[in-house]
Each structure stands twice: as C-alpha cells, then as structure tokens.
Amino acid sequence: MELEEQKKYFHGTLEITIFDATPFSPPFPFNCICTKPKAAYVTIKINKKKVAKTSSEYDRIWNQTFQILCAHPVTDTTITITLKTRCSVLGRFRISAEQILTSNSAVINGFFPLIADNGSTKRNLKLKCLMWFRPAYLEPGWCRALEEASFQGIRNASFPQRSNCRVVLYQDAHHKATFDPRVDDVPFNARNLWEDVYKAIESARHLVYIAGWALNPNLVLVRDNETEIPHAVGVTVGELLKRKSEEGVAVRVMLWNDETSLPMIKNKGVMRTNVERALAYFRNTNVVCRLCPRLHKKLPTAFAHHQKTITLDTRVTNSSTKEREIMSFLGGFDLCDGRYDTEEHSLFRTLGTEADFYQTSVAGAKLSRGGPREPWHDCHVSVVGGAAWDVLKNFEQRWTKQCNPSVLVNTSGIRNLVNLTGPTEENNRKWNVQVLRSIDHISATEMPRGLPVEKSVHDGYVAAIRKAERFIYIENQYFMGSCDHWESKNDKICSGCTNLIPVEIALKIAAKIRARERFAVYIVIPMWPEGPPESETVEEILHWTRETMSMMYQIIGEAIWEVGDKSHPRDYLNFFCLANREEKRDGEFEAVSSPHQKTHYWNAQRNRRFMVYVHSKLMIVDDTYILIGSANINQRSMDGCRDTEIAIGCYQTNTNNTNEIQAYRLSLWYEHTGGKITADDLSSSEPESLECVRGLRTIGEQMWEIYSGDKVVDMLGIHLVAYPISVTGDGAVEEVGDGCFPDTKTLVKGKRSKMFPPVLTT
C-alpha cells in the first residue's frame, strides 16, 4: 500500500536544515573596494511555490530548520533552494522528489555547489544543508498518539499546546427550548452562544477585547423571552460595551478596515462590513474602537483581518476566592447582521420579529419585498485556561502592531487575575488546546522562531488528517485547494490555490482503500458562496470548488480500480449542503411589494426555498480531535500572507464521563437531519461504516428531491441535502438535471471570471 503511494506521490514531511554558505569573498580586483558583505538569505520552493525563507544574515550562517508539508505528484515535483541577496540571485541547488525518494540514505546531507542562472556551476559558492523526508503513512494514528502522549501540537506555531483547559462548543447563535439532542439518554447541553457572550461581557471586571471582521453596535444578542437573563432582552452590543467601559472595564475593539469602503460617497465596500458605523457609534465614549486594514506588500485592499475573538476576564469557577481568569470566544461568528438564527433556520416565519433582515445572496432582496431571508448556520467555541491567554496574546500582538499599545491593560498588574495551568479536580478542564493562526509579521509582533509567516491553521488541518483512522467530518464556508492535482493545466498554474487539505483527504481515503479498511469523509458546504449566484466572484469560486471535487474523486476512483474493488467513490467521500423549504402558514409577514418576475428572487419566493448558509469552520476527526475557528478551507485563509485567521485544535485527555467531541458531532447531525440521526442509532457512533455513509446519503438525496421538486413540500426541519453533483464509478463528476442551482441560471460547476484575478477568489 505504502509503496504504491510512494510511486505516485511525494507525500509526507520534508525537513530541511539550512546551515551556512561559503563566506562572502569578492574576486580580484573588486576585493579592494567591495569589502562589506551583503545580507544573504535562502528560499525554498516546491516547483514555483515558495514554501520557506530564512532570515537575512551577513555572515551567511543560518542554522534554521523548516518542516515542509508535501503532497505532490512525484514525476512533476522539484525542490529548489536558492541563495539570494536583496538585489541578486547568487545561485541555486535543485533536487527532484524522485531523487529524494530513491536515495540510498534516509538523509541527504552535505555542502552543495550552487548553479548560476546560465547553468554554470559556481565551484567557490556552496551551501550546506540537510534534507530528511518522512512519508505520511508513518504518522501514528490519533488513538496511538494520544495513548503514548506523543502528540505535542503543531511545531511551527506561535503558541504551544496547553493542558488543563475548559472548552465549550457551540452551534448556531441560539436554540429553541425544544432542541434536545441526546447522547446515551443524557441530554447534550447545547448552550446558547449569544446569551453566554452577553453574560460573559456583563460579568467582566477588568477587560473586554474584541477582534472582528465586522461589528454592528445595534445588534441585539438576547431575543428569547424565555431566557435566563430577561433583563438582557433587547439590549444592544453597543449599549452593553459602553456600560462596561463606564464601569471602568477596558473595552478595546479592533475591526478590519475594508479599504474599499468609502463612507463619504456612501460606498459600503466590497465586503459590506459597515465598520464605520461602529467607529462612529463609539466615538467620544470610553470604548476604544480602531479600524485596522490588512496591510500587504502587494495588494493592500485585497485581503482581510478575518479573526473573530472576544477575550475577557471571568470568575474562577468552583472557587470561594475572588480570583479571576481569562476566557476567550472564537470561531465563525461576528457580532453583526444576519448571524442570529436557531436550529430551525426559517425562511419566511421570522421576518416580522427582528429589524435585521439579511439576504446578501439574492440580488435586490429587502424586507419590504419579503423573503426568503438567508438562514445562517455557524459554529463557535469558548476556552478557559492557558489557551485563552494565548488568544489574549494574539490580540495584544495585533493591537501593538497596528494601534497604540499604551491603551492595553497590563494584565500582570491585576492582582486577582490568575493563569491556572496546573491539574484541577474539574472534570471539564481535561482538554489539551493549541491556538493556531494564519498571520504574518506585517500584522503581528513576535512571530514564531523569527519566521515571517505563520500558517499553523493549515499545518493543523494536515496533521489531523494524516492521523485520521476512521472518519473526518467537515463543515466549512469554502472548500478548494491542492491545485497541483487539478485537471486543468491553466488552473494549476494561475490559481495559486496550493493548500494541501483536499488532496490530503483524498490520499488518506486512497490509502485506506488499498489497505481494504473502512474510512468515510463527510463535507458540508453552502450551495454557493455568499453573494448573488450570477456574480463573477461566486461563479469563479464554484469553478475552483468543482476542480477540487473532481480531483478528489479521481484519486479515489483510481484507488478503487487498482484494488479491483466493487465499491463506489461515494462510499468514502460525500459532499452535502444545507437547505430549507417551507409551506406557507397563517400569520406570516406580508410584503408590501413583490420581486420582479422571472428573477432569482421571484423564483425563490414563489417556490419557498433557499439554502441555509453554512459559515462554520470546523473539522472533527475520529470523534477524538476537533479544529474550529475562523479559517475557511481556501488559499486566502490558509496562506498566512493573505487573510489573518485564528483557530484552536483540541482534544480531551479524559473521556470517561462524556466524549464531548462525539456529542457535539451528534448534536450537529441531529440538527441537520431534524432528529433522524441520533445517538441511539448504532451507525451514528461508527461514522466510518458503510451503513452510516449510505444512511446519511439517502437522507441527503431524498431531501434534495423535495427541495428541487416542482411541488412546495415542507422539509420539516430536515436541512441536510446532497450537493447537486453525480459521481460515476470511476470518479468522474457529472451534472445533475440541467446543471443549475434551483431558481437560478447559475451552473453548479461555475466558470472562470474574466474580471477578477484568482488571488481574490481562491
């Protein structure tokens, strides 16, 4: 099995240590006038993609080690190590992936002569380096890694793995009282995120730090009259934050400044974040609000600060003292328009209840013309312990880089603020948690090991996938990557969508097929990315998504063919989306006008259907490890030099009482299937089983028929629908029906944009 994979794929971790190079020595007669050396650095590329860079050193001594994740075709992969100064290329050394894999020694070590651009060897210029390749199949699985306590977290991250943390997992902003997923006959405590956020902010005594993509100060967090905190009903975020600041709490708000947003001409910007509204609201108050652009050396307006965190102090639980500790929330939710929703994800039945009608995926939509609204499904997490302090540190590093650090609180001067890192008696503080980021030195101080870029979110995804033994469950707003394996040669070259997550999943499935072991992957994404489906950006993102799906199914189909199995690619990999369809009821909101006939808006309203927008960013592996945060599965989020992101990767060290990761997955499945999949179903506790795969797929296919049919039939709370593609036995992806999403003229397979460069849409 492993040898077959190695013949095709350079798949594993390439560790390269750059030691030093021949010292600077100008040739005669320039040695009399050019006595000062220039700072030199080394870059490492896989094919045309730069994957590592050393610091610049005058003495040409670096002693820097890089772990480079690889999942590339063997025949087309070359590693290029280049010695440079700021103004010139001094020389290169190239080695093919095939040479590394067929080397007699596991280690390639030595002083290597460098080659000039004209192909001549520079005998007096050598670079000392060491290369060592570890195939991915040698990675221990999660079960063994945790039993042996060998998993110590992601190496190239700013923050280490922290023990003795408390983690609470959330789905959706709020839940109805009737939402009751159960695990082993015990109700899963599905918490109400926005109520918990309100209570946490209200109880803060020293600091409330918020980093966001957007924030609406007029947003109401608590709206349910049956809440435990009735005094909070109707209170806006802005009112709450101003009140806390007047009590002496340091409230600091750091929002992304969309530089395409120009309030003087009433242009809301490409992303329509309306952050100027927050800035104006907090002006002349004790709340310090700052707008920070995502600075970038090439395209200053193209990328975003996409982190979503709330960090504050909270009372130490189960303590009779007045000690306080740090708590942090992070994930997919911003405190802004359209995010409030429940597990019901209604289209038409809640239009008259709140003043935040949100529908950005239908051109011309507004409340006066009626629904459907855009339902919102998202996931979030709160953490207490050492990892919460790391989220605080991330905020401080970003604020220090772009704002005035003097307005930050000196936490070491707060006497009763403690960091409880040691073992405790609390059963719920049995989590190991690591904070992961996508960020660079332009946006944060104190980068890990002096590296200019951190992409530990990407590395965390890859590490978790490589350790997977049974199944993977993903919910994400986007799913694209691994362009080196795409079918279109032009897309491979121009897209730059090189993150390895999709191909890692496909190679994991292929390896399991060759080993004749069960394995299953479930991926839930939106029907289309947010925005009118006929827009060029949406259509191009759909195109990249189709390339990614096709590549994965092709790899799986080839593995099935190689072993002569009679299984189908969809016995291993399935894509789903969420959707709703509602029959009309008495008492619904009545629009004062109607959409133009034959438009997408008119069709969706007449057919009473629309997608549930999946904004989650989470991955669950083997019910053992969960990665959750703000990062999408695309190049913008995984690159490190594009959007800034934050996430946590975590697992329980003791699951004797409850496996909370499994309970969370089952709660999500309970929501998506309207209670059809519960913890009582044997197959749901064995997600890798063919029974479970076919059970979920059957639900998805049946609900797609109801959703896409001509007759308006209520989906009765079952939102899981099969993504509208057909897959052949050999892994070819084909169209379903007319190839368009219902009510639209938009092709499911998308198409390339003639206007936007791929760097914006990948």
Swiss-Prot record:
One of its GO terms (molecular function) is calcium ion binding. A 1,2-diacyl-sn-glycero-3-phosphate binds at residues 306, 477, 615. Its EC number is 3.1.4.4. One of its GO terms (cellular component) is plasma membrane. GO terms for biological process: cell division; cellular response to nitrogen starvation; cellular response to phosphate starvation; cellular response to potassium ion starvation; multidimensional cell growth; phosphatidylcholine metabolic process; phospholipid catabolic process; positive regulation of nitrogen utilization. It comes from the Eukaryota. Residues 301-339, 610-637 form the PLD phosphodiesterase domain. SMART domains: PLDc. Disruption phenotype: Reduced growth. The active site is at residues 306, 308, 313, 615, 617, 622. Ca(2+) binds at residues 172, 345, 377, 671. The keyword Lipid metabolism applies. C2 domain is a calcium-binding fold, and the binding promotes the protein association with membranes. This is Phospholipase D alpha 4. It comes from Arabidopsis thaliana. The gene is PLDALPHA4.
